[in-house]
Amino acid sequence: MTKTLKIIEVKSEIGAGTRGASLGVDAIKIAALDFGSRFFKKHKSIEVPNENHLLLEGTGSPYAKRISGILTMVERVSDQVRTTLEEKEFPVVLAGDHSTAAGTIAGIKAAFPKSKLGVIWIDAHADIHSPYTTPSGNMHGMPLAMSLDEDNLESKVNKLDQETINYWFQLKNVGNIAPKINYRDLVLISARDMEKPEEYLLKKNKVKIFTTADVRKRGVERTVIDTLVYLDHCDLIYVSFDVDSMDPTASRGTGTPVAQGLTEREAGKLMSGLITNQKVCCFEIVEVNPTLDRENQMAEHAFEILIKATNAFRNE
């Protein structure tokens, strides 16, 4: 079945610790032009207004930097994803930093509140910190905690002020559904850089993780099958792809590169394999940062993965 794509552009980077991720969406568009592709002409797109002006101001809470702006962005992305799904279109989210993924998840739940949502998180990081456990305060490390309604107080290291506590509560409750996903409905792929509080949660909740080594040992096709079988009880599936899941040898054009990642070919096969599943209702590519790159390599890789994925479900 051919799906009508709608590209949702989220040029936000207030959740990241390094600057430049907000330029990633346009870098992917430039890569498309360089490849002579009409992809961005063929599919309609909408840009979500951003709060990047906050980068010129103070960070606010040291344990939840620019949290007021993050809340605004999560709400805006949620509204746009919900509207897109309600209009029977397939949202393809191209975003800067990964914090706004909490908005993508919130939007899917707003459109389908009674559906069980599975999440496939392809990322070097678990992104499951809360303001109570974060070592950096950068909120692109927290979207899954927002969606899981997770404070992880057992691993608490930071004392929060009341304003931060209030904003964090609001973030977890965007759309008045909390939690939006469950640990049993989550699969991490290529996760390899976690702190102790995150490892504690993943172990405690028996989260399904396929490391890069697992992917290579099983093969991409088997990994796709095993992931989808594991999430077979879910009604809908959302796939979020952070380009830092790929190895830095492919490109360093992302804010938090980590060795021992996927190759561009493995990532492309993985995404195109997952996307063909009928339950997949949305996918996302995040964290391309052309300011850290050479010759726009990462954006080119991201665009190639985008094309492989969309071609897979459009049967082109």
Report each predicted region and the residues it spans.
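Conserved alpha-helical scaffold segments that buttress catalytic/binding sites
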Residues: 2-316
